[in-house]
Regions:
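Generic beta-strand/beta-sheet core signal
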Residues: 156-158, 211-213, 250-254, 284-286, ...
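Rossmann-like NAD(P) dinucleotide-binding subdomain of oxidoreductase/dehydrogenase enzymes
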Residues: 619-773
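Residue-level signal for inorganic ion chemistry
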Residues: 514, 532-533, 553, 568, ...
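Positively charged, amphipathic and often flexible ligand-engagement surfaces
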Residues: 2-479
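Glycine-rich loop-to-alpha-helix module at the N-terminal edge of alpha/beta enzyme cores
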Residues: 531-623
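ALDH superfamily catalytic-core signature
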Residues: 690-695, 717-718, 723, 731-877
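Hydrophobic face of amphipathic alpha-helices that form TPR/SEL1-like repeat modules
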Residues: 439, 447-535
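Conserved C-terminal structural/oligomerization subdomain of aldehyde/semialdehyde dehydrogenase
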Residues: 389-392, 434-443, 529-541, 545, ...
């Protein structure tokens, strides 16, 4: 395989020299310190804490969770209380010193206050072991110290996770200020050979590292054009300022989800005439990504066309746990290598490829693994790569001894130096702590004096494509949502939307007894985001036609109830497969008929597929039944179909809930009539097409759109109805319960009602909450699909200490949402479903203005049923908007 061929080539050409250099580097990092340094190291409490956490996994988890929460806590009592709660977990084995610190009963007591002060100071000290400073003055001191040690730097501003446009604008301004301050300071520096001068060429004395997602709060691969426009507008300002001041800009790489769009934006921007000849720019690649080698090949080809070199910083990657968990949660292919050795091998392959193309690229080798750095040294020395085109990089606070050894060898070493306050720096700190305490960490293994021969051995991997396999085995696997970061998938989605728009305005007939029938009346289903756009005309059955459907269902039930469960289940599985095949088309129909943005529509289709497959598997499991025998008795427990099921589905989840209720009734042997909400009748017609194609027999399933007050009531009250499945408002649901309870002439059974009705959901934000996560989660829950879900966050209850800060960020984050037509990839929130809903929500907003304080209201576009995201503050529990379900984008902050 390719990986083995590359491995052999590296061994043959560079391995001997790599081993020699690596051995020397490790010996130098293990060199004995003088007695004072050894005493100082033994007394360092932060190293002791890391030793404790490494020895106890339970302590490590709880300690890192607590450290992550500290910046949000605003009093010593809160800190003491949280520390006690985290450290009292059963899995935690504490050293005696820490046990004494949590032995208090009152968080306000003197021992607790003392513990809190000690803990706070300790965490700050630990943080600034890895963070270069809290402000520019401290950072400049750090840079001066690095330069005296023969090293240079790149500065990274902590807190790049922006959730508002105000924060994105502030991020840009902070970098503009930073490079100006650093440039002023650099005027006092004398240029040093090796770090400021190489091969007779001056190297910028100022370098900063930036992340693209921080330049636009709505950065989204599904919206590449809009994201690129916003990001590039701000990047051009930064690049022009950097050119004016002579500063270098390096672009960091973030999560895999953003990688392709990040590379696309940079490749296009840096080909613009204004920036094409700039050589003081750089791009980062992460070797733990399976497609990173191909990315490097692509960058090499692009740089050749560009005609001017730039730097590629090669790192292994800092988000392995996050990438792995996200891929498992979404049932996507794992983007990162599962084995550390595979990452190390790929890093070596990429190092060789990068350095062997030094005529086109500058290489920055970022690693704390001595072997990785030694290989780079060996290749550079063998190929006689000019010093300007090659440098080593380490993280601030990590690999210090390695960096010093590399400087002694004559290499340029650049230290990646984050700076900022503790709160925005906490995520960075946790990543560093995880890296330092991981069993596979090279730094940890070297500190534990693992044999040199083992530390510098070549990485051995049987299969570079070895992926994580979930050991859980079930008869059901979730359908993965679409990953819109994939260009090919995104193009399919765009093409499907174009195709569906060409099919708008068609007529859809009811399906009764296997035949599509004519009706006297038709309903126009329109796009709520463009109310003049006809999605489809849907035939509305009469009461007489509803009776025909009941007769057909009753006749079909005789054979359907005897159909083996496996046969019924196979129809559902076929339906699920058809949904998967038509996923992008179905997404487009959902988007256009009910105003749901594409990713939300996609999640709904996944859920519908899951219903088909899960219920199929469950029915096969349940069919066998169970014996509950007693002495002298044979007792058989089994399920049998009830009869005719009437499904009344909602418009807010028009495909998922309609599918779930319908296929559950069908697979259990019941003949089913689907009466959808009027505003989502076309989507229900698409479900009908799928079930028919899947092989559902005539009369077993029937599509019966009609007026709820007539057809719906008739079906609910019909004597032959056995089961009613309903999702909708509490008012209608309660009426169905009441009507179903009435026995009709000739009715020999009691009806079963399965009703999911409205609700009033809330999110509680306490004083230890990560406000980045809390604000983003509330915005998504409250305004996703315009709040038209019973699960939407319509109330957020915030602890007093963080209330004002939370509200301010919540308002700014909501302001950053784009409201408009759901098929526009720039948009995060569409319209509400119809004019009736719009007018009802406006009435609630009017009441809210009378009772509470309006914190936010925005403008909306014309042409659809739009309601702006609306936030009220100062809401009391007895206020109308705090008590009643609004079913719209209205949020009460309490």
């Amino acid at each position: 395989m390719v990986a083995q061929a590359d491995r052999l080539e590296i061994d043959r050409r560079y391995e001997s020299q790599t081993q020699s250099i690596a051995g020397d580097l490790i010996k130098s990092t293990r060199a004995k310190n003088n007695i004072f340094n050894r005493m100082r190291d033994q007394m360092r409490w932060d190293d002791k804490v890391l030793e404790w956490t490494m020895a106890n996994p339970g302590l490590r988890v709880q300690m890192f969770r607590f450290i992550d929460a500290i910046p949000a806590l605003q009093s010593k009592a809160e800190i003491a209380n949280h520390f006690q709660q985290y450290m009292s977990a059963e899995a935690v084995e504490l050293p005696g010193a820490l046990k004494a610190m949590i032995n208090f009963s009152d968080p306000d007591s003197f021992p607790a206050q003392t513990a809190a002060a000690t803990i706070t100071k300790a965490v700050e000290t630990l943080a600034y072991k890895y963070i270069a400073g809290a402000n520019i003055t401290e950072v400049i001191k750090t840079i001066d110290r690095l330069r005296k040690s023969g090293m240079t730097y790149t500065i990274d501003l902590l807190g790049e996770a922006v959730i508002t446009e105000a924060e994105a604008a502030d991020y840009l301004q902070r970098y503009l200020d930073l490079i100006e301050q650093l440039t002023q300071k650099a005027q006092s520096w004398q240029r040093q050979e090796g770090i400021d001068l190489a091969d007779g060429e001056e190297i910028s004395q100022v370098q900063v590292s930036v992340k693209l997602t921080a330049f636009y709060s709505q950065f989204d691969p599904l919206n590449p054009v809009g994201s690129k426009e916003k990001v590039c507008d701000r990047l051009r300002i930064l690049l022009r300022k950097a050119a004016e001041l002579g500063a270098a800009i390096h672009f960091d790489m973030e999560q895999y989800h953003y990688k392709d769009l990040t590379l696309q934006i940079l490749k296009e921007l840096l080909m613009e005439a204004e920036f094409r000849s700039r050589t003081d720019l750089g791009i980062t690649l992460q070797a733990y990504l399976r497609d990173s080698y191909q990315d490097l090949q692509g960058i090499i080809n692009w740089v050749k066309k560009r005609g001017h070199p730039l730097t590629v910083r090669l790192v292994k990657g800092a988000y392995w746990d996050q990438e792995t968990i996200k891929s498992l949660q979404n049932h996507w292919s794992q983007p990162v290598y599962n084995q550390k050795a595979a990452t190390d091998l790929n890093y070596e392959r990429m190092t060789q490829l990068l350095l062997e193309n030094h005529e086109h690229l500058y290489a920055a080798i970022g690693s704390h693994n001595v072997r990785s750095q030694a290989l780079a040294c060996a290749i550079a020395e063998t190929l006689k790569i000019p010093p300007r085109r090659f440098e080593m990089q380490v993280l601030y606070g990590m690999g210090d001894k390695l960096a010093q050894s590399l400087v002694k060898r004559g290499h340029r070493v650049r230290v990646y130096s984050p700076y900022g306050n503790l709160l925005p720096g906490m995520a960075y700190l946790i990543r560093r702590l995880l890296e330092n305490t991981a069993n596979s960490s090279f730094i940890r293994q070297n500190d534990e004096a693992k044999p040199i021969s083992e530390l510098i051995a070549p990485p051995m991997v049987d299969d570079l494509d070895d992926r994580y396999i979930d050991s859980t085995t079930t008869s059901f696997n979730y359908a993965p949502d679409t990953d819109y970061a994939n260009l090919e998938t995104r193009l399919k989605a765009e093409q499907a939307l174009v195709q569906v728009k060409q099919e708008l305005g068609k007529t859809y007939q009811p399906l009764i007894n296997g035949e599509y029938i004519e009706t006297a009346n038709y309903l126009d289903s329109v796009n709520p985001c463009r109310s003049s756009e006809l999605v489809g005309k849907v035939g509305q059955i009469s009461v007489e036609q509803a009776e025909q459907a009941m007769i057909a269902a009753k006749a079909a039930f005789k054979s359907w109830k005897k159909t083996p469960a496996t046969a019924r289940a196979n129809i559902l599985r076929k339906a699920g497969d058809l949904m998967e095949q038509r996923r992008h088309e179905l997404n487009a129909w959902i988007c256009l008929e009910v105003g749901k943005i594409i990713p939300q529509a996609d999640g709904e289709v996944s859920e519908a597929i899951d219903f088909c497959r899960y219920y199929a598997a469950e029915m096969e499991r349940l069919e066998s039944g169970k014996n509950y025998d007693l002495a002298g008795e044979n007792n058989r427990y089994f399920y049998q179909p009830k009869g005719i099921a009437v499904v009344i589905s909602p418009w807010n989840f028009p495909f998922a809930i309609a599918t779930g209720m319908t296929v559950a009734a069908l697979v259990t042997g019941n003949c089913t009539l689907l009466k959808p909400a009027a505003t989502s009748s076309v989507i229900a017609a698409k479900l009908t097409e799928i079930l028919v194609e899947a092989g559902i027999p005539p009369g077993v399933f029937q599509y019966v759109p009609g007026k709820g007050s007539e057809v719906g009531t008739y079906l609910v009250e019909h004597k032959d109805t056995h089961v009613i499945a309903f999702t909708g408002s509490r008012e209608v649901g309660c009426k169905i319960y009441a009507d179903a309870a009435q026995l009709k002439p000739g009715q020999k059974h009691l009806k079963r009602v399965i009703a999911e009705m409205g609700g009033k959901n809330a999110i509680i934000v306490d004083e230890s909450a990560d406000l980045d996560q809390a604000v983003a989660g509330v915005v998504q829950s409250a305004f996703g699909y315009s709040g038209q879900k019973c699960s939407a966050c319509s109330r957020v209850i915030v602890a007093a200490p963080v209330h004002n800060a939370f509200l301010a960020r919540l308002v700014e984050a909501t302001k950053s949402l784009n409201v408009g037509a759901a098929d526009d990839p720039n948009v995060q929130m569409g319209s509400v479903i119809d004019a009736v809903a719009r007018d009802r929500i406006l009435e609630y907003i009017a009441q809210g203005k009378q009772q509470s304080e309006l914190a936010l209201s925005m403008s909306t576009p014309d042409g659809g049923y739009y309601i702006p995201p609306t936030i009220f503050s100062g809401v009391n529990p007895d206020h109308t908007i705090a008590q009643e379900e609004i079913f719209g984008p209205v949020l009460a902050v309490m």
